[in-house]
């Protein structure tokens, strides 16, 4: 039986809260897992504190280090990422190194860095 993701999401969307609760319980029993949120591990001593802080970082900055040789492609990428106008994006690229995006999720930041690198720029995730 082929059950694709879209059909599954449609089925979930039509379920009531009670039905969803029963589904969660059935999944827990079937696979031996728990839907309870995991508690954050307690912070270690002073030596482990720095490593724990680095792992917990949730907001990232995308930094344009260098525009590279293909400035036009980089300006287009910056416009796509930021939604800036042409002049603002050009000024940002010309003023490198500069933050392109600040305080964004890791997945979004990685996607932005990838787009800038593909356009020929040198970009960093901080």
UniProtKB/Swiss-Prot annotation:
GO terms for molecular function: mRNA binding; structural constituent of ribosome. CDD domains: Ribosomal_L7_L12 (cd00387). One of its GO terms (biological process) is translation. SUPFAM superfamilies: ClpS-like, Ribosomal protein L7/12, oligomerisation (N-terminal) domain. GO terms for cellular component: cytosolic large ribosomal subunit. Keywords: Ribonucleoprotein, Ribosomal protein. InterPro entries: Ribosomal_bL12, Ribosomal_bL12_C, Ribosomal_bL12_C/ClpS-like, Ribosomal_bL12_oligo, Ribosomal_bL12_oligo_N_sf. Belongs to the bacterial ribosomal protein bL12 family. Homodimer. Part of the ribosomal stalk of the 50S ribosomal subunit. Forms a multimeric L10(L12)X complex, where L10 forms an elongated spine to which 2 to 4 L12 dimers bind in a sequential fashion. Binds GTP-bound translation factors. Forms part of the ribosomal stalk which helps the ribosome interact with GTP-bound translation factors. Is thus essential for accurate translation. PANTHER family: 39S RIBOSOMAL PROTEIN L12, LARGE RIBOSOMAL SUBUNIT PROTEIN BL12M. This is Large ribosomal subunit protein bL12. It comes from Acidovorax ebreus (strain TPSY) (Diaphorobacter sp. (strain TPSY)). The gene is rplL.
């Amino acid at each position: 039986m082929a059950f694709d993701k879209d059909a599954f999401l449609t089925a979930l969307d039509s379920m009531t809260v009670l039905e969803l609760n029963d589904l969660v319980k059935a999944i827990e029993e079937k696979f031996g897992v728990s839907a309870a949120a995991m508690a954050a591990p307690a912070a270690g001593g002073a030596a482990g504190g720095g490593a724990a802080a680095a792992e917990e970082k949730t907001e990232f900055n995308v930094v344009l280090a260098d525009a590279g040789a293909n400035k036009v492609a980089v300006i287009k990428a910056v416009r796509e990422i930021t939604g800036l106008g042409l002049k603002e994006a050009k000024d940002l690229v010309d003023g490198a190194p500069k933050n392109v995006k600040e305080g964004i999720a890791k997945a979004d930041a990685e996607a932005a860095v990838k787009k800038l690198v593909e356009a020929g720029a040198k970009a960093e995730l901080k």
